[in-house]
Amino acid sequence: MIHQHPESFPKHFLWGSASAAYQIEGAWNEDGKGPSVWDVFTKIPGKTFKGTNGEIAVDHYHRFKEDVALMAEMGLKAYRFSVSWPRVFPKGKGEINEAGLAFYDSLIDELLSHHIEPVLTLYHWDLPQALMDEYGGFESRNIIEDFNHYCITLYKRFGDRVKYWVTLNEQNYNFNHGFITAMHPPGVKDRKRFYEANHIAFLANAKAIESFREYVPEGKIGPSFAYSPAYPLSSHPEDILAFENAEEFTNNWWLDMYCWGTYPQIPFRCLEKQGWAPTIEAGDMDLLAKGKPDFVGVNYYQTITYERNPLDGVSEGKMNTTGQKGTNQETGIPGVFKTKKNPHLTTSNWDWTIDPIGLRIGLRRITSRYQLPVFITENGLGEFDKVEDGTVQDDYRIDYLRSHLEQCRQAISDGVDLIGYCSWSFTDLLSWLNGYQKRYGFVYVNRDEESTSDLKRLKKKSFYWYQDVIKTNGESL
């Protein structure tokens, strides 16, 4: 559809930005915090770019008031952050660390004092190492109750001030890298374990939402899904079939479960034949049916194009984690699909396709299939930012964000109920696998892989651009 006069953004649209605890906080062992799996995993040689870790990160734990003041100067309407589970429960359960809760109390109150809506993510990958050691984390059903208890603790503490909540961040991406590529904890390659752990995470998500209804009845909650809408390489029927397979296995497998409480039938039957289907116990489907969210959180960075993959075809290919453009390799599942470079799209230095219209397509697909509001919980461009003459002229980021926001406006005109938009990220931060070289923020942080330097904050050109977008409610786009 072509709209001659696109609709404006809603009056109370949540113009925001986002972060994650491990990537910004630092203070990894201060004030009673316990270790997370990432505190341990990053110590394994070769697991991260130049051995980087989040021990200091960008020191948000000690500088949050400075960071929130910058958010207020920009005019942010919302800020999405995550709570570190082991900062609240050092051993994942049992004794509460009051100092951890107090930190998030202070952060939330600081945000609210500047009229910034807090958007709280319950789980952004920093599983307490104690639970990994005790029972294997999400490979055990024990985690369902432990996660629920942790969530209830936060609901009771912050539910009077926080309206918007995210349950699990990018479950699909995190578990894929944990159990398929071995690039995230626990660092194994086992598809059966992948689907079993993923099923348990679905149960934990549903249980957390069920409890949310009791403790924060006026709030809104949903998962954040790493959404890469699928395209076929061509109109050849075999490529169309590969595209359909990709949509089912990489998107609908999660979104159907989040929104409907059921697995898509065709991929489930395929997994049964392979011996990879998750174990479904009595009561599972009843619980999953109770986990319907209030919105679908979308973390959008790119679309992915697929073509036919023969039975002896491509499996796992190497992922570009260096920023050396052109080093990403094709990946796939033999007999199901394989990825292919889209000739119509440009890419970032990390070989991620730049496709603003793909965001609109994805928003429409979710709206038509699930009929739920959508909250863009991440979208942004990671690049090699350089300080020149005391500033960062990141016009490439402005172009990226503008083009995606223009498509958000088109999607709203199409009929998408879009709650808000959180860019990734507000400040520069630690990239899980790419160190500090891959910068996303509106605010430059003076540090790199070799040195923490002075961690000075510097507003980039994009800071002032987004400030104006917010001020005009998107009319300046």
Curated annotation (Swiss-Prot):
Function: Is able to catalyze the hydrolysis of aryl-phospho-beta-D-glucosides such as 4-methylumbelliferyl-phospho-beta-D-glucopyranoside (MUG-P), phosphoarbutin and phosphosalicin. Is not essential for growth on arbutin and salicin as the sole carbon source.
Lineage: Bacteria, Bacillati, Bacillota, Bacilli, Bacillales
Listed Pfam families: Glyco_hydro_1
Top enzyme category: hydrolase
Keywords linked to the UniProt accession: Carbohydrate metabolism, Glycosidase, Hydrolase
Listed name of the protein: Aryl-phospho-beta-D-glucosidase BglC
Presence of the UniProt keyword Ribosomal protein in the record: no
Induction data: Is not induced by aryl-beta-D-glucosides such as arbutin, salicin or 4-methylumbelliferyl-beta-D-glucopyranoside (MUG). Is not repressed by glucose.
Name of the gene this protein is made from: bglC
Gene3D superfamilies documented for this protein: Glycosidases
Domain of life: Bacteria
One BP term from GO: carbohydrate catabolic process
Record PROSITE patterns: GLYCOSYL_HYDROL_F1_1, GLYCOSYL_HYDROL_F1_2
EC number: 3.2.1.86
Molecular-function annotations in GO: 6-phospho-beta-glucosidase activity; beta-glucosidase activity
GO CC terms: cytosol
Residues of the active site: E170 (proton donor), E378 (nucleophile)
InterPro entries: Glyco_hydro_1, Glyco_hydro_1_AS, Glyco_hydro_1_N_CS, Glycoside_hydrolase_SF
Catalytic reaction list: 6-phospho-beta-D-glucosyl-(1->4)-D-glucose + H2O = D-glucose 6-phosphate + D-glucose
Protein family per UniProt: Belongs to the glycosyl hydrolase 1 family.
